Each structure stands twice: as structure tokens, then as C-alpha cells.
Amino acid sequence: MGRELLRAALDQAEINRLITRYWRVSVVELTSTTQGDLVQLVRDGKANAGDVIVAEYQSAGRGRLDRSFEAPKSTALLFSFYIEPKRNRDDWGWIPLIAGYSVAQSLHAFHAKIKWPNDILAEQKKIGGILIENSIKSSTEILSIIGIGI
């Protein structure tokens, strides 16, 4: 995949048309961080499970331990999504593993691997990361916001 393919603008209407059954996607030109935006929407009660925010550019992307993550405009896939897994509390620890496995499988053509706990590697080089924030909604419910930057 050439870099020119990554420069095409994201088409929010087309994305929603293709996946509208499960997800509601919002594409933004610029944000400080998709993760922060979605966390705030959840806190304000303005987000639903299945909401996704995709950005053309993040000015203050972040990783674990508040490390920064930055990529030039339209050169990276930057998104966060909100889920409410309907699983037993004992299963909540699997969320990061499932997210990492899913990313690696999606990028299998590039021989992607996950380096614990959240780095995405291809040819032994870091090409992205995964950031997961969980909040306990009740004794049996969890909210998860999963951010991915590639």
C-alpha cells in the first residue's frame, strides 16, 4: 500500500453507509485526541456504544503513561471507539488482548504483531499503538473506549 492511498480524505457518509448497522462514525478534520473527545462525550452522556471518532489529524495524540503520539496530517489511521461489553466481570481483562489480536489480524498482510502491552509492530518497527480506557458502570457493566493509531 502506497502512501498516496493514505492521503485520500475520509468520507464519513460512505463509512457510515457501509457499517451503519453496528457503528456510528464521526470524521473530524482536526482534534487534540480522538480518545479524549470520546471520553468526554461518554462522561457527558452524549455517546452510545458503537460510536467511533476518526481524525485526519490529532494535535495531542497520546499513548500509555501519557506519552505523546503524533503523525503528519492524513498519513495515519487515528480513531477511537466506544463499546459496552456484555461479559462477565472476569472476562474484562481480555479486552486489551482481543483489541490487539484484532489489529494484528487486520494488518496480517504487513506481518503485524503486537508487542505487549500496546505497541503495533511491522518488520520489528513500531507502526502504531492501542490505548484502552475502561470505566466501571456498575458491578456487572463496563465501558471501554479503545483508541488505535496506525
Predicted regions and their residues:
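Acidic (Asp/Glu) carboxylate-rich active-site/surface patches
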Residues: A99-S139, G149
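Short glycine- and Lys/Arg-enriched binding-loop motifs that mark or flank ligand-binding interfaces
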Residues: Y57-R62, I120, K125, L143-I145
